[in-house]
Swiss-Prot record:
Species of origin: Bacillus cereus (strain ZK / E33L)
EC number annotated for this UniProt entry: 4.3.2.1
Protein name: Argininosuccinate lyase
Pathway: Amino-acid biosynthesis; L-arginine biosynthesis; L-arginine from L-ornithine and carbamoyl phosphate: step 3/3
Listed GO CC annotations: cytosol
Pfam families: ASL_C2, Lyase_1
Subcellular location: Cytoplasm
SUPFAM superfamilies tied to this protein: L-aspartase-like
Gene symbol of the encoding locus: argH
Keywords recorded for this protein, A-Z: Amino-acid biosynthesis, Arginine biosynthesis, Cytoplasm, Lyase
Lineage, highest ranks first: Bacteria, Bacillati, Bacillota, Bacilli, Bacillales
Keyword Cell membrane: no
Length: 462
């Protein structure tokens, strides 16, 4: 077929060259955005008198027809037409005649594709924010059901201090809240229009960029045409924000994988989110959590790939920028899928409160409580730390725990020890006493839950 840009050429490209350079296999995902962008563009052209109202109306009717066909997956794209833009333009001309060729007046594929991606990411970021809020709602429900579920808190993957399981869950709620805030802030950069920037230098036609931006729901326009067509910061920012979100999901999945093991037995995954072994009949594998952990690397790769593509590109457009889309599409699909699976996995998991409780009583995670006890009686904390360290050594040598040590032994270490010492050794009491702002104390958890519920309700309303 003859190319829409073929006037300057005397030889046709080999079929394999056409296939290598074509992007329609993946950029067809922008079909709705491309058509909507064209409808706004031709509406602006008519307003400015660049095309007649009759011509614009005919073009819009043709575009609306193609949009309906696209929604029903009835459009047949061709590699020969290269990309989504030329495919749509070719179909439009076939549908309404040569007047369809006027659609591209005052526009280049460079600003056209940038506009498509801005529209696409605006929609997808809002979807991801909503899905993240739904996951946060699941976390709030689990936290509400586990305020008084006591578990070991860890540092270096060693038992450190008793905490509420709700407190642990809410840590991820606040990580996700930052993720939502990052996505929301990125919309300021996504929601601006490059349409009308042309190939790189603007256009000689008297277009109204602000009007077409308004029609598409953008908050403003790029102030520099070179920047408009060469900018991919908004995609990089999306990929970066998504990488951070996936890192948070991956960290949580790592813990879920550990907790579901026989060594921990803190939780049990629902059968819906686990698989078995083809050879070992006893196995129940946390495959969904492992997949989310694994797919995190995939999202990282998409970010690093585009950063590498962009680092050496001179202004303005270069064909290298065709490589900006597949990683973006893949990240959207991956993040949306992981958020959905994560919400279902957490909603259906069973918490083994008894095992968590056993873990926190058969360890030395209450050692800090004794140090704080001595410090509250006036002993410098460093001296208290030394005394408790010796007590722990004594216990490990005897094969006992701090709660088993008789008061006489405590008094040999320090005269400040009294009978009330045993009250602070209870894991429940240890958690309850940590009532500083943001701490694991039950009162603080209740306050945190109120804030969290307010944030999720507000998001649902919006």
């Amino acid at each position: 077929m003859s190319k829409l840009w073929g006037g300057r050429f005397t030889e046709e490209a080999e079929a394999w060259v056409e296939e290598f350079g074509a992007s329609i296999s993946f950029d067809q995902q922008l079909v709705n955005q491309d058509i909507n962008g064209s409808i706004a563009h031709v509406t602006m052209l008519a307003k400015q008198g660049i095309v007649t109202k009759e011509e614009a109306e005919k073009i819009k009717i043709g575009l609306q027809y193609l949009l309906e066909e696209a929604k029903q997956n009835k459009l047949n794209f061709s590699v020969e037409a290269e990309d989504i833009h030329l495919n749509i333009e070719k179909m439009l001309i076939e549908k309404i005649g040569e007047v369809g060729g006027k659609l591209h007046t005052g526009r280049s594929r460079n600003d056209q594709v940038a506009t498509d991606m801005h529209l696409y990411l605006k929609e997808k970021v809002e979807h991801i924010m909503k899905a993240t809020k739904q996951l946060q709602t699941v976390l709030v429900h689990q936290a509400e059901n586990n305020i008084e579920t006591i578990m070991p808190g860890y540092t270096h993957l060693q038992r450190a201090q008793p905490i509420s399981f709700a407190h642990h869950i809410l840590a991820y709620f606040w990580m996700l809240e930052r993720d939502v805030n990052r996505y929301e802030d990125s919309l300021k950069r996504i929601n601006i229009s490059p349409l009308g920037a042309g190939a790189l230098a603007g256009t000689t036609f008297p277009i109204d960029r602000e009007y077409s931006a308004e029609l598409l729901g953008f908050n403003g326009i790029y102030e520099n045409s070179l920047d408009a067509v060469s900018d991919r910061d908004f995609i990089l920012e999306f990929l970066s924000n998504s990488s951070i979100l996936m890192m948070h999901l991956s960290r949580f999945c790592e813990e879920l994988i550990l907790w579901s093991s026989q060594e921990f037995q803190f939780i049990e995954m629902s059968d819906q989110y686990a698989t078995g072994s083809s050879i070992m009949p006893q196995k129940k594998n946390p495959d969904m959590a492992e997949l989310i952990r694994g797919k995190t690397g995939r999202v990282y790769g998409n970010l690093f790939s585009l950063l590498t593509v962009m680092k050496g590109l001179p202004l303005a457009y270069n064909k290298d920028l065709q490589e900006d889309k597949e990683g973006m599409f893949d990240t959207v699909k991956t993040v949306e899928g992981c958020l959905h699976i994560m919400a279902g996995m957490l909603e259906t998991m069973t918490v083994n409160k008894e095992k968590m409780g056993q873990a926190v009583t058969q360890d030395f995670s209450n050692a800090t409580e004794i140090a704080d006890y001595l410090a509250s009686k006036g002993l410098p904390f460093r001296q208290a730390h030394e005394i408790v360290g010796k007590l722990v050594l004594h216990c490990t040598q005897k094969g006992i725990y701090l709660v088993d040590v008789p008061l006489e032994t405590y008094k040999e270490m320090s005269s400040l020890f009294e009978e009330d010492l045993y009250e602070v050794l209870s894991p429940y009491a240890a958690v309850k006493r940590r009532n500083s702002a943001g701490g694991t104390g039950f009162e603080q958890i209740e306050k945190a839950l109120e804030k969290a519920k307010g944030l999720t309700k507000e998001a649902i309303k919006n």
